[in-house]
Amino acid sequence: MDLMCKKMKHLWFFLLLVAAPRWVLSQLQLQESGPGLVKPSETLSLTCTVSGGSISSSSYYWGWIRQPPGKGLEWIGSIYYSGSTYYNPSLKSRVTISVDTSKNQFSLKLSSVTAADTAVYYCAR
């Protein structure tokens, strides 16, 4: 029984260790903004505003994902606050992600949209 208590203490310590960063970041909020609809061949432009923390105060990447109707999530790309970008190879030629640390925002531009780009778009950290 004593051994079980020791194991439980270690488990709780581990859980607290894992959960602590999430408590600290729980106030962070991301809000997408942009047009609801874009016509074929046009450029989709979306902005994500970060509140509850500075976009440049952490070593995290900020990104965009999308979910087409009836399908799973698809990663579009990510950006570091310094401007380093990484894009989904299948979208790379049409995607630009940029960051504006003065406004605490990062943005997505997807050019030459088609019906295949129909999806719900999300910003994420």
UniProtKB/Swiss-Prot annotation:
Pfam families: V-set (PF07686). PROSITE patterns: IG_LIKE. Disulfide bonds join 48-123. GO terms for cellular component: extracellular region; immunoglobulin complex; plasma membrane. Residues 27-125 form the Ig-like domain. Residues 86-123 are annotated as: Framework-3. Coiled coil: none annotated. Its main location: secreted. One of its GO terms (molecular function) is antigen binding. It comes from the Eukaryota. Residues 79-85 are annotated as: Complementarity-determining-2. Residues 27-51 are annotated as: Framework-1. Residues 52-61 are annotated as: Complementarity-determining-1. Keywords: Adaptive immunity, Cell membrane, Disulfide bond, Immunity, Immunoglobulin, Immunoglobulin domain, Membrane, Secreted, Signal. PANTHER family: IMMUNOGLOBULIN HEAVY CHAIN. Immunoglobulins are composed of two identical heavy chains and two identical light chains; disulfide-linked. V region of the variable domain of immunoglobulin heavy chains that participates in the antigen recognition. Immunoglobulins, also known as antibodies, are membrane-bound or secreted glycoproteins produced by B lymphocytes. In the recognition phase of humoral immunity, the membrane-bound immunoglobulins serve as receptors which, upon binding of a specific antigen, trigger the clonal expansion and differentiation of B lymphocytes into immunoglobulins-secreting plasma cells. This is Immunoglobulin heavy variable 4-39. It comes from Homo sapiens.
